[in-house]
């Protein structure tokens, strides 16, 4: 991780003032890559504000990182996961469809249902659900039955 990215993550910590968080957003405006904002394991104290920063990043910049963002949504108890889910709900359905379908199919044989709780609202989107494959519908229905 480069020095500027480390500085941004440190400034986004819940322990820093809002003024410092604003400074982090200013630095972020010039960042070439945003991958360092996505669930940075070494900066747990920054997760919530990293997720909030993602609200200001356009869909096209988020699109290459959708698998990692969906994994964050799956981590239900992690700070920021619900915020990331809200951000993805606002994303263009055409961008979200393929990565979401891949994510769901990867969890077809999972014993844990955390993935389902994390992405079920995304999959239920009226623009996405009808476009999912039969196989993906079956996986979602099977998970829903396990929940009941």
Protein language model regions, located:
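Amphipathic alpha-helical scaffolding segments comprising HEAT/armadillo-like alpha-solenoid repeats
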Residues: 1-10, 30-41, 59-72, 93-105, ...
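Eukaryotic acidic, Ser/Thr-rich intrinsically disordered low-complexity regions
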Residues: 2-6, 112-148
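Structural detector for internal amphipathic alpha-helices that build alpha-solenoid repeat scaffolds
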Residues: 10, 18-30, 48-60, 71, ...
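Short coil turns that connect the paired helices of HEAT/ARM alpha-solenoid repeats
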Residues: 11-16, 40-47, 74-79, 106-111, ...
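Short, intrinsically disordered/low-complexity patches at protein termini
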Residues: 104-107, 120-122
């Amino acid at each position: 991780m480069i020095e500027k990215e480390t500085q941004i993550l440190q400034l986004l910590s819940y322990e820093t003032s809002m003024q410092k968080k604003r400074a982090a957003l200013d630095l972020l405006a010039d960042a070439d890559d945003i991958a360092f904002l996505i669930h940075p394991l070494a900066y747990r104290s920054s997760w919530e504000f990293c997720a909030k920063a993602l609200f200001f990043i356009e869909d096209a910049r988020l699109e290459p990182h959708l698998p990692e963002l969906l994994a964050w949504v799956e981590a239900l108890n992690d700070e920021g996961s619900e915020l990331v889910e809200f951000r993805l709900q606002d994303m263009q359905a055409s961008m979200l469809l393929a990565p979401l379908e891949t994510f769901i199919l990867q969890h077809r044989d999972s014993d844990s249902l955390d993935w389902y709780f994390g992405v079920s609202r995304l999959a239920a989107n009226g623009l996405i659900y009808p476009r999912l494959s039969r196989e993906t519908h079956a996986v979602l229905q099977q998970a829903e039955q396990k929940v009941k």
